[in-house]
Regions:
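Residue signature of alpha-solenoid helical repeat architecture, marking inter-repeat boundaries
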Residues: 15-16, 38, 58, 98
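Short coil/turn linkers that connect adjacent helices within long alpha-helical scaffolds
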Residues: 11-12, 52-56, 90-96, 132-137
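Structural motif corresponding to the intra-repeat A-B loop/turn of tetratricopeptide repeats
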Residues: 31-34, 74, 94, 114
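Amphipathic alpha-helical segments of tetratricopeptide repeats
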Residues: 45-50, 86-90, 128-132
Length: 137
């Protein structure tokens, strides 16, 4: 066995780093403290950069959702909405609607928290439509 067999390829090292950043970011979100939200934001930003670097659209969506959750936890609701809308936009390029229903519900909830009931209602309607579509499949 030569030494090359023992070394990770740059791609697999990047994939491992990406997966680790996403995993650790999700774990920090569960702590629900400001320092944990700040650290998770850093990890999801790192994951987003790595996902874009390797061209992994699924991981890009996951990192973007993580950024939204981190920002929401830090009280940046408008930033969270912007990231969740990015997730919905990505569906058009990826062709995969996984996670869209949750994103729609989260956007509706955040608009409710902001007191913007008109937009909240709009996104709750979209959320319910998406739920009904999922149940029909």
């Amino acid at each position: 066995m030569d030494s090359m067999d023992l070394e990770e390829s740059p791609a697999s090292a990047t994939d491992a780093e990406l997966s680790g950043a996403l995993r650790d970011g999700r774990a920090l979100l569960k702590e629900e403290t400001e320092p944990a939200f700040r650290r998770s934001l850093e990890l999801f930003e790192k994951a987003l950069t790595l996902a874009r670097m390797v061209g992994d659209t699924t991981q890009t969506r996951r990192a973007t959702r993580g950024l939204a959750a981190s920002k929401r936890g830090l009280g940046d609701r408008k930033g969270a909405i912007a990231h969740l809308k990015e997730v919905l936009e990505m569906r058009k390029t990826v062709g995969d609607a996984a996670g869209d229903t949750d994103a729609l519900g989260a956007i509706a909830d955040i608009y409710t928290e902001l007191g913007d009931l008109e937009n909240a209602g709009k996104f709750y309607d979209l959320y319910l439509d998406a739920l009904n579509s999922e149940m029909m499949q």
